[in-house]
């Protein structure tokens, strides 16, 4: 008896595609309360070996591991869920990794712009202010890249406060996801397009 030749890779791709709702992949809608960090986890299921930062060369999996290291480091220095954390101006891509580490523990990132540190402490309760002189890679590398979040924020919870235009503007995880999606549509960006970002 002759059996037909099946392309298992193609079958798996078709099954995965059938599980998508529009451009939302299964991992993104199966997590009860998706957030920015949930999307990074989802990217690693399908694109773990894709290079997302050219210099230094960092893949999706490397980025995720740096986030995990950073989350463990942040906990070790006393950062708590929902606590605002001022993001220092670090060498690229350390600030970008730091913000995801902040979100991974359920804390809130603060872009201070030109606002003085003392003004931040008067406007935000219990803000953690990190030094501009740290090297995140050196600080976090001694910590495990396994991190189990004790708190996962809901979409409506604060993710980012920005003082770059004066008064603080508060953005939730939902706001960030919607804004990113709107930018993607406005610029007609296709899936897997690489963009340079330097916080």
Which role fits each region the language model picked out?
Residues 1-77, 81, 142-162:
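N-lobe entry segment of adenylate-forming
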Residues 35, 62-69, 90, 94, ...:
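Short secondary-structure boundary/capping elements
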Residues 43-44, 102, 121:
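A generic structural signal for well-ordered alpha-helical segments
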Residues 123-185:
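ANL superfamily adenylate-forming
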Residues 59, 116-117, 172:
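Short loop/turn segments at beta->alpha junctions
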Residues 99, 109-133, 179-196:
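Conserved ATP-dependent adenylate/AMP-binding module captured primarily in the ANL superfamily
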Residues 81-84, 155-156, 173-174, 191-193:
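Short acidic capping loops at alpha-helix termini that bridge into adjacent secondary structure
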Residues 32, 54-57, 71-115, 194-199:
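Conserved AMP-binding/adenylate-forming
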């Amino acid at each position: 008896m002759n059996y037909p030749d099946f392309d298992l890779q193609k079958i798996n791709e078709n099954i995965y595609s059938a599980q998508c709702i529009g451009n939302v992949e299964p991992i993104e809608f199966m997590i009860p309360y998706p957030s920015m960090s949930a999307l990074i986890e989802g990217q690693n299921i399908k694109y773990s070996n894709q290079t997302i930062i050219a210099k230094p060369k960092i893949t999706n999996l490397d980025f995720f591991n740096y986030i995990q290291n950073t989350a463990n480091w942040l906990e070790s220095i006393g950062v708590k869920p929902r606590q605002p954390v001022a993001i220092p101006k670090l060498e690229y891509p350390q600030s970008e990794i730091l913000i995801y580490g902040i979100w991974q523990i359920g804390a809130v990132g603060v872009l201070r712009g030109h606002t003085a540190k003392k003004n931040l402490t008067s406007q935000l309760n219990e803000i953690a202010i990190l030094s501009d002189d740290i090297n995140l890679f050196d600080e976090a590398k001694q910590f495990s890249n396994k991190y189990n979040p004790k708190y996962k924020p809901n979409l409506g919870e604060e993710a980012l406060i920005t003082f770059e235009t004066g008064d603080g503007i508060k953005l939730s995880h939902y706001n960030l996801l919607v804004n990113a999606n709107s930018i993607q549509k406005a610029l007609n960006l296709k899936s897997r397009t690489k963009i340079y970002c330097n916080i």
